[in-house]
Structures are given as C-alpha cells and as structure tokens.
Amino acid sequence: MAGSGWGLPRLDGFILTERLGSGTYATVYKAYAKKATREVVAIKCVAKKSLNKASVENLLTEIEILKGIRHPHIVQLKDFQWDNDNIYLIMEFCAGGDLSRFIHTRRILPEKVARVFMQQLASALQFLHERNISHLDLKPQNILLSSLEKPHLKLADFGFAQHMSPWDEKHVLRGSPLYMAPEMVCRRQYDARVDLWSVGVILYEALFGQPPFASRSFSELEEKIRSNRVIELPLRPQLSLDCRDLLQRLLERDPSHRISFQDFFAHPWVDLEHMPSGESLAQATALVVEAVKKDQEGDAAAALSLYCKALDFFVPALHYEVDAQRKEAIKAKVGQYVSRAEELKAIVSSSNQALLRQGTTGQELLREMARDKPRLLAALEVASAAMAKEEEAGKEQDALDLYQHSLGELLLLLAAEAPGRRRELLHTEVQNLMARAEYLKEQIKIRESHWEAESLDKEGLSESVRSSCTLQ
C-alpha cells in the first residue's frame, strides 16, 4: 500500500477514481476492485495526521459496529486497511447519492414515497435497537440511496454511534444541531430516544421541504431548540391522520412523552409487517389458505377480508422475488385471487347495503333520544357523513377519517352514558361503525400501497387488486 501524495490515494487491489464527498476527518472516493469482478466500492480515506483522540474513538467505533452487522438497509463495511498515512474503510457503493440531495431536488416527497423510505429506515433502526446500538447522528446526509432507479435506503456514517441500552445516559454532545434532540442541547443528558427525534426531523423535512428548526443564524436555531413551544405541523400538503400522528409523537420535546421504540416500530403508518422479505410469500400463502376455507364455508365477508390481507403480502413478495419464472407464477396466483375477490366483493357489498337498511330504525331512534345531547347528536351526524362519503367513488380515506373522528367522540360518550335503552342503542351503533371503519381500513391499505404495487402496475394487475379490495 502507498500513501496519497498530491493525487488520489493509492490502495492495493483497487483503482480510486472520483471523489464522492468529504467530512471533518475523511474523504470518500469511488473505486473499482482490480479483480475480475471489477466490483464498485466506496472507500473512506482517513488521514492519520488529522485524527485527534475523539476522532480516533469515532473511527474505531464505526469499524467495530459495521464489521459486525449485515442488514439490507445499512451500508456494508466490506474490509478495512491502513498504511503509513491513511486508514481505509472499504464500503458498499451507493449510486443514488444521499437522501438530502434526493429531497431537495424534488423540493418535497409525496407521503407514499416518504412512507416507503421511513419503513426502510425503521427496519434498520429496529435491527440496531435489538443490538443496543444508537446512531446518534441521524440526518438525510447520512442516509444513502442504493440507486436513483427504485432506490433503497442505506443508513451510513456510524462515527458517532454508541452501544447504548435504553436506560443508558450520555453527556457528550454529538450530532448535527438541526437534527439534534432538544435534550442533547438543553440538558446535555440523553439516551437512545434521541434517534427517534432525529427520525421525526428527517420525516418532517421529507414531507415539508425543510427541518422544523430551519434558521438563518445559529442564534435563531439555538432559540428554537431551547424553546418550549410544541412543534406545529403545516396544514399543507395534506397528510393522512396516521402520518400526522407519528410525526407529532416523534417530535415531542420531552423524551418521556416521545413515542417509544416499540410503538414506533409497531405504528400503522410505518407498517413494518408488510416490508418485502423472504417471509412475504409464506405469509400471503397462509392467509390464502384461510381465505379459501372461509370461502368454502360460505363466509364471504371473512373470505374477502383474508384475500385482501393476502394481497397485502403478495405485493411485497413480488418486489422481493428476483427469479422471473417464480415471479410469473406468483403473478398468475394473484390474478386468480383478484378474480375471486371481485366476485366476493359483489356479494359482500349487497349484504352490507341490506344491513345498513335494517339498522336505519335503530339509528333513527338513537337520534330521537339524542335530541337533548348536542355533543352526541353532532357525533352521530359525523357518522352519517362518513356513510355518505363511503358511497362516493374514491372517497374511502375521507370516509375513514370521518368514521374515526365520530368514533373518538362516541366512545367517550358511551363510557359516560348511564345504563338504559339509549346506552344499548349507542353501544350497537358504535359496534356497527367500528366494523365499517375497520373493514374500510383493510381495503384502503391496498390502495395506499403505491410503490409496493409498482411492479404490479407494470404487469397490469394493480388496478384489479385495488378495485377488488375496495367496496363501492
């Protein structure tokens, strides 16, 4: 091995080409392996003379953590070498640049795109959390993209990372101020939950175009960090309720009120359950077996629900599958299940309309008994608006939002209602509305899977999947 001299560094076994970027103590180059494979890699070149004690510790931590982990959404450390002048980290090459550039060239990301990226980032963080590793410098510049064509996120730059149990506390200031949790600045005392705040800032920037503490000066930034004001979300662009809920819970200034790691990983907007994986096909197949059984028993509603849940796993299974022949086989099966779902949808839709007509008398009586309860009457009016909205084509999400708003009120009123006929009617109405909302939610999940359904779009199936799993 030889040092860099005045040109590009030289490293045995590799040809270094263009410079990709540079940081405080390292420069990253694109390189090719001299082997027959001509593998493309990124080489992080750290000049020994630039290292102080803290940067040596950071570098050793990065090597220690990365050499022991393998995950599809974490940049892989392939090897490391050194000579008299430099230390070289030979890394997986990510051709798509970083997430910061990706966001800013598009100004903002659609919610559906941000959701897929967040799912991938959450998967990487779950993997690290299970090993008590905290990144401590999460920001878009440290999140790389595998390519610009169907990019996958790759978490990088573990220089500040630490082995931290959830109850461990640190006092050393680490990270970038725009993405740094308030407790790191205000208290100089923090734990693993700072990564959750940073995730919230990244998501906020992806959806709104800039971080919540974007400032023109450092003093303005410090004032915003030290403020006690609640982080307010812009009204535009319009986001789903689940997305706004997650953002607000991530961006809690007080870490004791911030969403927990387990609740973050389980959050419905993150939806780790439906990430493309080697298990996706097996999960889809198991649900289809249950669907066929219910279908044979004549339970059309249960069968349709199970077919739709199965399709929720077939879409990521198609994304995960790389073998063309197996992909075609999966596609053929999906076509069969879509056809059967279409038939079941007609049966269930007809049945639901009949049930709604049957329930009209009870609903009208409940409204009569709610005349002296303006709050109850208002909540029932919202429920009626939800039912009307559900009848409009393409308004399923609006209907679900109204159902959820109505149920939020009705459940509180039900808990406070005294025993009697009105309570019985209210209980029945709540059960009916919850069933409608839950069923509608299942159908919307397929419609919301934009990127996951992209492969199906090309194969002409996604519209069939979406329409089959949505009752009109």
UniProtKB/Swiss-Prot annotation:
User: Which residues are modified to Phosphoserine?
Assistant: 176, 350, 384, 464
- EC numbers for this chain: 2.7.11.1
Give the main EC class: transferase
Could you tell me what this protein does?
Serine/threonine protein kinase that acts as a regulator of Sonic hedgehog (SHH) signaling and autophagy. Acts as a negative regulator of SHH signaling in the absence of SHH ligand: interacts with SUFU, thereby inactivating the protein kinase activity and preventing phosphorylation of GLI proteins (GLI1, GLI2 and/or GLI3). Positively regulates SHH signaling in the presence of SHH: dissociates from SUFU, autophosphorylates and mediates phosphorylation of GLI2, activating it and promoting its nuclear translocation.
Q: What is this protein called?
A: Serine/threonine-protein kinase ULK3
Keyword match Repeat: yes
The encoding gene is Ulk3
Q: Which CDD domains match?
A: MIT_2, STKc_ULK3
One GO term describing the cellular component: cytosol
Give the organism, scientific name: Rattus norvegicus (Rat)
Q: Where is the active site?
A: 137 (proton acceptor)
Q: Where does ATP bind?
A: 20-28, 44
Question: Which GO MF term does the entry hold, naming one?
Answer: protein serine/threonine kinase activity
Instruction: Give me the reactions it catalyses.
Output: L-seryl-[protein] + ATP = O-phospho-L-seryl-[protein] + ADP + H(+); L-threonyl-[protein] + ATP = O-phospho-L-threonyl-[protein] + ADP + H(+)
